[in-house]
């Protein structure tokens, strides 16, 4: 499994847009709010970060390959530095859940516009 597979999955989420922020970080957003960060660009990705449910934050940060995401940990974001930490299906589910968590915080009107 590679970080590229997670980036592809993030891009496939409904309403997802991609941008390069802070000079080199690849950011997937929904409704202007980021839900997945990988970097740097260009070059091979060495880590990615995404939002998780509050009840999963401590569990995940206790696993090898996961840590609290710099600058975003208080918002329950984790950083994944080892793409082999979990099975691809579970990592894809976590990225999908990150998208859902951010989407839920958007206005109902914007949610309707973004969802097919």
Which residues does each PLM region occupy?
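Charge-dense, helix-prone N-terminal extensions
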Residues: 1-116
């Amino acid at each position: 499994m590679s970080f590229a597979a997670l980036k592809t999955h993030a891009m496939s989420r409904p309403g997802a847009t991609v941008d390069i922020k802070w000079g080199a970080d690849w950011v997937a957003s929904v409704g202007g709010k980021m839900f997945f960060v990988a970097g740097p660009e260009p070059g091979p990705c060495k880590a990615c970060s995404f939002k998780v449910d509050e009840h999963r934050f401590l569990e995940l940060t206790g696993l090898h390959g996961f840590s609290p995401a710099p600058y975003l940990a208080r918002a329950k974001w984790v950083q994944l530095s080892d793409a082999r930490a979990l099975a691809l299906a579970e990592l894809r589910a976590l990225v999908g859940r990150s998208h859902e968590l951010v989407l839920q915080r958007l206005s109902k009107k914007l949610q309707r516009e973004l969802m097919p």
